[in-house]
Design a protein with these regions (language model features):
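Single conserved hydrophobic/aromatic residue that forms the stacking wall/gate
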Residues: 1-8, 12
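Short, solvent-exposed loop/turn segments at secondary-structure junctions
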Residues: 13-15, 48-50, 98-102, 149-150, ...
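A short, glycine/small-residue-rich beta-strand->loop->alpha-helix junction that serves as a flexible
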Residues: 13-26, 52-54
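A short, Lys/Arg-enriched amphipathic alpha-helix followed by its capping loop at the start of a domain
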Residues: 29-39
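A conserved catalytic-core segment of Leloir-type glycosyltransferases
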Residues: 47-135
Length: 186
C-alpha cells in the first residue's frame, strides 16, 4: 500500500469548492478514500475568488496568521483559511492572498486569456502550502501534487527543503491532467 499514516495531498481543484471537472472529482475521491482508509490527509488549494466562503464555512486560521511569502522582491501576506469537507473528517487548507486570488476567475479572464501573473500565483501557492505545513509541524510521508499550479512543489522541496526534517523523508507523487491548459508561464 503506497500511503502511510500521514499524507499531505496538494491539489489545485477540489469539489465541492470549485465547479466539478476531472481534476476536482479525482482529487476529492482520492483524498476521501485515503482518509477513509485511516490515513491523515490534508488538502491544500488556492482560495480563488469564485469560492463562496460563507456557503463553505471557510474561516481564517489565526495561529497561522502573520506569515509572508517572498517572491522575487515582493514580500506578500499569506492568509490561511480552513474548511471541513462535507461528509468526511478531513480539512482543506486554502492558501490566500488578495493580489493573486481575489479575482472571480481561476486561471483566465472573462475572455479566456491566461492571467499574466499565473507564474507568480503558482509560486505563491507552492511556497505558501509548504510554509504552512512547516508552521503546522505536520510531517507528511507522501506529498501528492495535482495539476500544473502545484507542479513547482517537488522542485521547491528538492532545492530549498532537502534537509528540512519535516520534508526530507517525504515521497512525492505528481499527477498530471489534460485540463486544457494552453500557453506558458514566464
Amino acid at each position: 500500500h503506497l500511503y502511510h499514516r500521514r499524507q499531505r495531498q496538494m491539489c489545485i481543484r477540489d469539489s465541492p469548492y470549485l465547479p466539478e471537472n476531472t481534476i476536482s472529482s479525482t482529487t476529492l475521491a482520492l483524498a476521501k478514500k485515503t482518509n477513509d482508509s485511516g490515513h491523515q490527509v490534508r488538502v491544500f488549494m488556492p482560495r480563488f475568488g469564485v469560492i463562496n466562503e460563507r456557503r463553505h464555512q471557510l474561516h481564517e486560521v489565526i495561529r497561522l496568521s502573520g506569515m509572508n511569502v517572498v517572491i522575487n522582491d515582493m514580500d506578500l501576506p499569506l492568509i490561511i483559511k480552513v474548511a471541513s469537507v462535507p461528509g468526511a473528517r478531513m480539512q482543506v487548507y486554502f492558501i490566500d492572498n488578495e493580489e493573486f486570488f481575489k479575482r472571480k476567475f481561476t486561471y483566465t479572464d472573462a475572455e479566456g486569456a491566461q492571467f499574466e501573473d499565473n507564474d507568480e500565483r503558482t509560486l505563491f501557492f507552492s511556497k505558501g502550502a509548504i510554509d504552512t505545513v512547516e508552521k503546522l509541524g505536520w510531517k507528511p510521508d507522501i506529498i501528492h501534487v495535482h495539476g500544473w499550479m502545484s507542479s513547482l512543489v517537488p522542485m521547491y522541496l528538492k532545492l530549498f527543503q532537502a534537509d528540512n526534517p519535516i520534508f526530507k523523508d517525504a515521497k512525492i507523487v505528481f499527477s498530471a491532467y489534460d485540463n486544457g491548459f494552453e500557453g506558458g508561464l514566464s
